[in-house]
Regions:
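Active-site and donor-binding regions of nucleotide-sugar-utilizing enzymes
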Residues: 2-168
Length: 168
């Protein structure tokens, strides 16, 4: 439905359901940063720009879920040999495995607080370092997660480092 309402890129939509055969950095460590929306993308771009500028041995893969975030990245003209933007593949187990097998990230940074169960479980299983940057949770959401304590514990223990948006 999003594709037909022009909220998706007609050509790049397939990135959400498969791994495209774009440039792959064979000789560099892949650091994967996921910022779901345009606001999260905008907030993490200064960090990405610094990483690209100061670390030639790493490759930054930035994923997002929205067309507007992709358009923002195009405007910033970040695409070079050390950076690539892709759309975040759907949180479906076989797609998650295919994506992680292709990119083989050495570090993963998720921005804000969306929870992707299949990604978190597979990342944890592969022991890939995972950081939550600018994490936050509302009281209402916290109460909901308390209903499923075992699942919550398993998912949130996937993170190696959580840097909250505030101390509250």
């Amino acid at each position: 439905l999003r594709r037909f309402s022009k909220k998706e890129d007609k050509i790049r939509f397939k990135e959400k359901i498969s791994v495209s055969e774009n440039f792959f950095p064979d000789n560099k460590k892949v650091f994967w940063v996921h910022a779901a929306s345009v606001g999260e993308t905008n907030s993490v771009l200064p960090l990405i720009e610094k990483l690209i500028k100061n670390n030639k041995e790493i490759f930054i893969l930035l994923t997002s879920t929205t067309l507007s975030s992709s358009q923002l990245i195009k405007k910033k003209k970040l695409n070079n040999d050390n950076f690539q933007h892709r759309f975040f593949p759907l949180d479906v187990q076989f797609l998650v495995k295919k994506f992680l097998n292709h990119w083989k990230p050495k570090l993963i940074i998720f921005i804000d607080s969306e929870v992707w169960p299949n990604y978190l479980l597979e990342i944890s299983k592969r022991k890939i370092p995972l950081v939550l940057l600018n994490g936050r949770i509302t009281t209402k959401t916290f109460k909901r997660w308390k209903i499923f304590p075992n699942l919550s514990r398993k998912l949130f223990n996937s993170y190696d480092l959580c840097l909250p948006a505030s101390s509250e």
